[in-house]
Amino acid sequence: MSGKCPVMHGGNTSTGTSNKDWWPEGINLDILHQHDRKTNPMDPDFNYREEVKKLDVQALKNDLRQLMVDSQAWWPADWGSYVGMFARVAWHSAGSYRLADGRGGGGTGNQRFAPLNSWPDNVNTDKGRRLLWPIKKKYGNKISWADLMVLSGTIAYEVAGLKTYGFAFGREDIWHPEKDIYWGDEKEWLAPSDERYADVEKPDTMENPLAAVQMGLIYVNPEGVNGQPDPQKTAEQVRETFARMAMNDEETAALTAGGHTIGKCHGNGEAENLSAEPEAADVEYQGIGWMNTKGRGIGRDTVVSGIEGAWTKNPTQWDMGWFDMLFNHEWELKKSPAGAWQWEPVDIAEEDMPVDVEDPSIRRMPIMTDADMAMKVDPVYNEICRKFMDDPEYFSETFAKAWFKLTHRDLGPKARYIGPDVPADDLIWQDPIPAGSIAYCEEVVKQKIAESGLSIGEMVSTAWDSARTYRGSDMRGGANGARIRLAPQKTWPGNEPERLAKVLDVYERISAETGASIADVIVLGGSVGIERAAKAAGHDVHVPFLKGRGDATDEMTDAASFAPLEPLADGFRNWQKQDYVVKPEEMLLDRAQLMGLTGPEMTVLIGGMRVLGTNHGGTRHGVFTDREGQLTNDFFVNLTDMGNTWKPAGNNVYEIRDRETDAVKWTASRVDLVFGSNSLLRSYAEVYAQDDNEEKFVNDFVAAWTKVMNADRFDVA
């Protein structure tokens, strides 16, 4: 009898050749279709942000404090305290955030899923989540995994003795791994850093948007660049990686010192004796990975990074011990029992050593990683650390604020914060926006805009440019705040500064006359343009509008932190800043995903924008109509017309010719033609090209447009 499975493989439940295997160059529309009802086990009307308001916060915090000192035999706590473990669970949840695209971070509970649950840098965070499970089980729907993991780290620091800065609830769990996050191209864990740097000697040449030096790490290699100790080189990598998650040198030094004030590294054993990571573990392991298969593997015999030892004399207490240890001793390179490079003091009194995690009568050698040594060797970090040493209270305050920033950076603006411990202060990295007025007449504003002489293209383009900066990844950007009129946005090439200045001059005058914020006037301008274009095409529509946007000021805006929000391409306006290795249609998909659009929404917006005269610089690519300024489905009708042919005519330029006469009718970009060439996008385009769907096209365009304009309105229910 054949050894093959007797069951017919009717369902692709595990492996099989995928479309991506057959056609690796195809675009991945799956990134637009994530986190829907089919993967979410919660009831359709479940609203976590309302449910968490019912939480008994004090009871939860009390239970977490008890957990910190409730050592479990199956995974005993070091020195009887889990504070180091839960600080690490929270840190490694939040620490995957990167400023470049806002992706990663602790806002979704993604540490529960691959690849993060099985990253080499996340060894044994699975044990932390299992220790949290009884608490999650008890409080159920009132606390998300995302909130619980981050809160556990904050409570850990409080138990250790730190006065924390605050905490906000509001992180909503996802139910499958994100498909849109690019973690790197490497095919092996901890592949050499050279694979993601143009020049590993120049940290700023790391591939964007990455913010970790190797595949599977949160930040840097604790042993040194590519595992070779050199504190100054490591300092340069530390500076770059932390900058890529929006931390300055002082915040970086504080986080390094404070992060290593509690807990320890684990490397007292052989790494090769560990079982597979959670995602590869056999079913009997029940999602737990890295278990020691040849020894005890817990307590003092635990293996995580391979480095072995604590940084301070009192690893469960918040104090200045890290500074005392690092700056009051000379250090030499040693190998841990697991074979990892670590720094150990050349000469240290026994009473200054930390005790064994299980037996307080035994003293153990303290350690420093290469990243710790970087704080001493690098002159900038050294100066900051000495400032902290001279003022311990300032250090504690700086760390507490940096920890709050680390764990809340991807939660979005302060309007999204929930709970009794939300700090009163407005912090500049939260992109604060003042409340806007609602005491004005919307129709009066619209009438003034309509009589201003602005074209449909000018009105719609300005509203779009203001709103398109929104990123659902970290809830930054968007039309609220009208930051399009501030640096750096007002000079971005993608915003056509000359055209923008002309429109803003009109809108600022209307704002002053009516009491509406400039932000509201900008969005209303888009509404006026769309309603005018729809009427010209025979459709009487009203674009929904929400009053109350505010106008941010330069003082409220960290211009440098907004630089990563600059669009390098905008397929919706048929524009690229320059040629890139990445295809234009892939950049369109990325933009659409960050804006929270679905495939059909992206499609209908492209078709509508093309006929409204919104192309950047007035280019004619994709304007498949002789009725520009009317909201028609002509783009789709002519794109899908087999009476045409499509021929390359230069770099990212194509000609649409009459099939019989060969006369050029229109020109197009790759972004235009992908809606006819990609089978999925063509299926959407055909819907909007149908004779009976012109009204549907208009209604769907208005709905998608409104979604974009309101994406950042967290200030309203």
From Swiss-Prot:
Q: Which Pfam families match?
A: peroxidase (PF00141)
Cross-link Tryptophyl-tyrosyl-methioninium (Tyr-Met) (with W-91): give the residues: 219-245
- Record-listed cross-link Tryptophyl-tyrosyl-methioninium (Trp-Tyr) (with M-245), residues: 91-219
Q: Does the keyword Flavoprotein apply?
A: no
Which region ranges are annotated with the description Disordered?
1-20
Question: Which residues act catalytically here?
Answer: 92 (proton acceptor)
Q: Biological process GO annotation list?
A: cellular response to hydrogen peroxide; hydrogen peroxide catabolic process
Task: Output the superkingdom of the source species.
Answer: Bacteria
| A single GO cellular-component term on record | cytosol
- Reactions it catalyzes: H2O2 + AH2 = A + 2 H2O; 2 H2O2 = O2 + 2 H2O
Q: Which cofactor does it need?
A: heme b
In chain numbering, the residues marked as site (Transition state stabilizer) are: 88
Q: Name one GO molecular function term.
A: heme binding
The record's account of how the chain is modified after translation: Formation of the three residue Trp-Tyr-Met cross-link is important for the catalase, but not the peroxidase activity of the enzyme.
Q: Which Gene3D superfamilies match?
A: 1.10.520.10, Peroxidase, domain 2 (1.10.420.10)
UniProt entry keywords in alphabetical sequence = Heme, Hydrogen peroxide, Iron, Metal-binding, Oxidoreductase, Peroxidase
PANTHER family per record: CATALASE-PEROXIDASE, HYDROPEROXIDASE I, BIFUNCTIONAL CATALASE-PEROXIDASE
Q: What does this protein do?
A: Bifunctional enzyme with both catalase and broad-spectrum peroxidase activity.
Q: Which family does it belong to?
A: Belongs to the peroxidase family. Peroxidase/catalase subfamily.
Q: Assembly state and interactors?
A: Homodimer or homotetramer.
What's the name of the protein? Catalase-peroxidase
Lineage summary: Bacteria, Pseudomonadati, Pseudomonadota, Gammaproteobacteria, Oceanospirillales
Encoding gene per record:
katG
